A protein has these predicted regions:
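Active-site-adjacent loop/helix segments that line or gate small-molecule/cofactor pockets in enzymes
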Residues: 73-77
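Short catalytic helix/loop segments, enriched in acidic residues and glycine
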Residues: 52
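ATP-binding/phosphotransfer module of carbohydrate and carboxylate kinases, centering on a glycine-rich
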Residues: 1-26, 36-39, 57-67, 79-89, ...
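Short beta-strand segments
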Residues: 28-32, 94-100, 104-106
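Short glycine-enriched, charge-decorated loop/helix-capping segments at active-site entrances
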Residues: 41-48
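Structural signature of FAD isoalloxazine-binding scaffolds in flavoprotein oxidoreductases
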Residues: 118-121
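Active-site glycine-centered loops adjacent to acidic/histidine catalytic or metal-binding residues
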Residues: 72, 98, 270
């Protein structure tokens, strides 16, 4: 089963790195879903179809060491906090723009989990009343407008509406369109692509402004494949968020930067979970 496969993987990683597993003090795991960090209990994980999953204790029995289990977005945020774009700051928010929008919040050097261990779901803050249906059951959630998949959706819609856009020449099949296409076409001067990008970035900025107004972090790190666009993405997001932020009284605006650890953030954060207590 999955737990045995995870235990075998842990031992394999230790062996491949010439580490005696008996010397391992603890194992850290990041998983999607609602996670009770104290008990290692996963309330639900829709990716694997697990509900009421006693992951931490079950793995401890298999491995013979302490196992820390954390929400994957929190683990990624902690990774950026200790070794990436948020290193050196006490208050940080890490936003990942992907299929949805993942978010992890660090306040005073500690992961914000909430009393039900589900705090920080910024992607499910509603920004458009009665807007697009979200998988969570609500309508108008931020991730339905500002995720990478939302950008892909709007790119396809724009292509269908404009058969003359150069985006048709840049892809073999509309079903293979990704979030990068509109950026590439806009860089070539395509007006349709530019409108798609401008609208999408505005939605990203709306959510980032909400993050600032709610948590006032020192730094916001933006991750996901679209963050590879660098200042093409970050500069207008900063400008929009700064214009929409109302509670900055010191003249200091949060740093808004790209994540540095990319896909390794969650691994690094999970590996360091024991030090976060």
């Amino acid at each position: 089963d999955l737990e045995k496969a995870l235990a075998d993987l842990c031992r394999t990683v230790a062996r491949d790195n010439k580490v005696d597993f008996a010397d391992i003090k603890y194992v850290g795991i990041g998983t999607p879903g609602s996670v009770n960090f104290t008990t290692g209990f996963v309330g639900f994980n829709t990716n694997f179809g697990y509900y009421d999953w006693n992951l931490g204790p079950d793995l401890e029995a298999l491995l013979g060491c302490k196992v820390y289990v954390e929400n994957d977005a929190n683990a990624a945020a902690y990774g950026e906090y200790i070794a990436g774009g948020a290193k050196g700051y006490n208050d940080a928010v890490v936003i990942t723009l992907g299929t949805g929008i993942g978010s992890g919040i660090i306040l005073g050097g500690k992961i914000l989990r909430g009393f039900n261990f589900a705090a920080g779901e910024m992607g499910h803050n509603v920004i458009v009343k009665d807007g697009i249906q979200c998988t969570c059951g609500r309508r108008g959630c931020w991730e339905r407008y500002a995720s990478a998949s939302a950008l892909t959706r709007e790119t396809k819609a724009a292509m269908q509406a404009d058969k003359n856009t150069i985006m048709w020449k840049m892809t073999q099949d509309i079903d293979h369109v990704n979030a990068k296409l509109a950026f590439d076409a806009a860089a070539k001067g395509d007006e349709t692509a530019r409108k798609v990008i401008d609208s999408w970035i505005e939605y990203v900025g709306v959510g980032i402004a909400n993050v600032i107004n709610t948590f006032e972090p020192e730094v916001i790190c933006i991750g996901g494949g679209v963050s590879n666009q660098g200042e093409v993405l970050l500069a207008p997001v900063r400008a929009y968020a700064e214009n929409e932020t109302r509670n900055i009284t010191t003249g200091k605006f949060p740093v808004i930067c790209a994540c540095q650890l990319h896909n390794d953030a969650g691994v690094i954060g999970a590996a360091a979970l024991g030090s976060s207590i």
